[in-house]
Amino acid sequence: MTKNIGKITQIISAVVDVKFTNNGELPKILNALECYNDKQRIVLEVAQHIGDDTVRCIAMDSMEGLVRGVEVIDTGSPIRIPVGTETLGRIMNVVGEPIDGKGDIKSSNISSIYKPAPDFTHQSTECNILVTGIKVIDLLAPYTKGGKIGLFGGAGVGKTVLIMELINNVAKAHGGYTVFAGVGERTREGNDLYHEMIDSGVINLAEPEKSKVALVYGQMNEPPGARARVALSGLTIAESFRDMNEGQDVLFFVDNIFRFTQAGSEVSALLGRIPSAVGYQPTLATDMGELQERITSTKYGSITSVQAIYVPADDLTDPAPATSFAHLDATTVLSRQIAEFGIYPAVDPLDSNSQVLDPMIVGEEHYSVARQVQQVLQTYKSLQDIITILGMDELSEEDKLTVARARKIQRFLSQPFHVAEVFTGAAGKFVNLADTIAGFKGLVEGKYDDLPEAAFYMVGTIDEAIEKAQTLK
């Protein structure tokens, strides 16, 4: 079969026009094209057909040094990446090339990054709770196996640290594989995460096949084409793990889904599409839907997805985070106000929610305790204006008691993380669900009204709080 060869006619930023004149056959939309820039392979993806013989493409790599007239070959298929157990313990880029300096990924399975979502008949509707060991999440916004979870927060409130703790707690306790897609985030964080995984044994350098995680990175310095597609590359690997050996449970982490939207917006502008609200691409909902609908559980295996979602200027009504809301089963909202109090994880207990916080699923006791905790915190929030203006002395005895309990609950929602041990010096805690429910039940019932507030700060179980109270006396 003769190769379909074209030539570059125009380069504007990350957009490249390629003219095919030899046999009049244009590459299909989304096909991958290859060219070489000083022996370096560059992949282009067909985005538009303009005229009879020219295609407009988005580059997946840096364009530095590329010139007009360079030959381009149509590969005849979309971007294809290696999948399967050979990817474990390795870092690859959007087009499946290893970037960890450890040689080629020798996989016999190569898969396109574009696939249809599983049929309705193949999807699973079972509902099982995924225990994370993080009190505030397990009690107030529990995660489901095979669910989609969003971590919402502005800059610097702890999204990446929370994701790293979830990888530490869930991936270690969980039998299946994990895929981490780094979408447009800091290269330093990607490097830190990789070395942390090596130190904790999640990645085994001596025997990579014993590793539990595959990493796909398209960091901040990459062109928008790579950042817009790297989540799909990560998802393709996650799907291959889910469907292998008659089904596996897979964890799929994306940090950060906002950068996926942001890159799509850049690509859209470069292609000359008219922007919609706040300058986002007109296809925002479609792009998000195509990614999210593939993250699902089948009758054989599940993909549980945790997605960090940056909130521009802390505005949850911005179209990018707002479009994500519709697809999620649980939302964990990180609050700057709570972080300023020094309470970590800075999860907002009133804004965060989960579809599975239902007595039919979590049980009557769990549901009742969670709602009582939220009620106490909501009452405290509504009393805050009175406290600010008139002071605590003007409150009724009942309200004073509610405020005291709420402040203890707030502090008890904090917890030392394993991955933050190097910063805090405090040993990380994994708290079982039964201990979490028992602790908060005692707090709302007033069993610990005599203990000082400070005893509840940065501890695991209620027994640790009681021990800490003894040392504070």
Curated annotation (Swiss-Prot):
* CDD domains reported in the protein's UniProt record: ATP-synt_F1_beta_C, ATP-synt_F1_beta_N, F1-ATPase_beta_CD
Q: Which PANTHER family match?
A: ATP SYNTHASE, ATP SYNTHASE SUBUNIT BETA, MITOCHONDRIAL
Organism, as annotated: Rickettsia conorii (strain ATCC VR-613 / Malish 7)
Membrane topology recorded in Swiss-Prot or TrEMBL: Peripheral membrane protein
HAMAP family, per database record: ATP_synth_beta_bact
Name the InterPro entries for this protein: AAA+_ATPase, ATP-synt_VA_C, ATP_synth_F1_bsu, ATPase_a/bsu_AS, ATPase_alpha/beta_chains, ATPase_F1/V1/A1_a/bsu_N, ATPase_F1/V1/A1_a/bsu_N_sf, ATPase_F1/V1/A1_a/bsu_nucl-bd
Report residues binding ATP: G153, G154, A155, G156, V157, G158, K159, T160
Q: What EC number(s) are associated with this protein in UniProt?
A: 7.1.2.2
Task: List where in the cell it is found.
Answer: Cell inner membrane
> Which NCBIfam families does the record cross-reference, listed alphabetically?
atpD (TIGR01039)
- What's the main place this protein lives? membrane
Gene that specifies this protein: atpD
The family this protein is said to belong to: Belongs to the ATPase alpha/beta chains family.
Protein name, entry field: ATP synthase subunit beta
The UniProt keywords, alphabetically, are: ATP synthesis, ATP-binding, Cell inner membrane, Cell membrane, CF(1), Hydrogen ion transport, Ion transport, Membrane, Nucleotide-binding, Translocase, Transport
